Swiss-Prot record:
Its main location: mitochondrion. GO terms for molecular function: NADH dehydrogenase (ubiquinone) activity. The lineage of its organism: Eukaryota, Metazoa, Ecdysozoa, Arthropoda, Hexapoda. Keywords: Electron transport, Membrane, Mitochondrion, NAD, Respiratory chain, Translocase, Transmembrane, Transmembrane helix, Transport, Ubiquinone. The gene is mt:ND6. It comes from Anopheles gambiae. This is NADH-ubiquinone oxidoreductase chain 6.
Length: 174
């Protein structure tokens, strides 16, 4: 159930991101989207340290983009659209209602899972802690690790290109 709510929030953030016009609000939406993605990754991998590292890397990239945007954009006023806020709230509530109506056994499964988790929490905690670090380099998640390495390399190249001393947007003004 938690995974479903987080995925719905990711979907709604994607819709909201397409409606944003101000670069700083786009950066904020991208940061929230990254946080939700890290939550989903942490829940699936059962080890949040990988999600924490991923979030810190994206945060570093976002800080570089923030410096770039603030040096280029003028002092535009940032206003929140009431219509966009209501649209996202209605979309989220409507999607949750549709999920509950279409899947009548979802609530029953949720209650059964909560009861089962109470009993198996201690046994699984010991076994999962041993295997959770091994999962990072095995098949399903090794692709995420390779993607992270490529992202870091691309971010390094972009950072070097942006921060050239006399040619980039961060050059000193005369």
């Amino acid at each position: 159930m938690t995974k479903l709510i987080i995925m719905m929030m990711c979907l709604i953030m994607s819709f909201i991101f397409m409606q944003m016009k101000h670069p700083l609000s786009m950066g904020l939406m991208l940061l929230i989207q990254t946080f939700l993605t890290c939550l989903i990754t942490g829940i699936y991998v059962k080890s949040f340290w990988f999600s924490y590292v991923l979030f810190l890397i994206f945060l570093g990239g976002m800080l570089i983009l923030f410096i770039y945007v603030t040096s280029l954009s003028s002092n535009e006023m940032f206003t929140m659209s009431f219509k966009l806020t209501m649209f996202s709230l209605v979309l989220f509530s409507l999607s949750m209602v549709i999920f509950f109506i279409l899947d009548k056994t979802l609530i029953e499964q949720f209650i059964i899972n909560m009861e089962m988790e109470k009993f198996s929490m201690t046994n699984n905690l010991i076994n999962e802690n041993i295997l959770s670090l091994n999962k990072m380099y095995n098949f399903p998640t090794n692709l995420i690790t390779l993607l992270l390495i490529n992202y870091l390399f691309l971010t390094l190249l972009v950072t070097v290109k942006i921060t050239k001393k006399f040619y980039g947007p961060l050059r000193p003004m005369n």
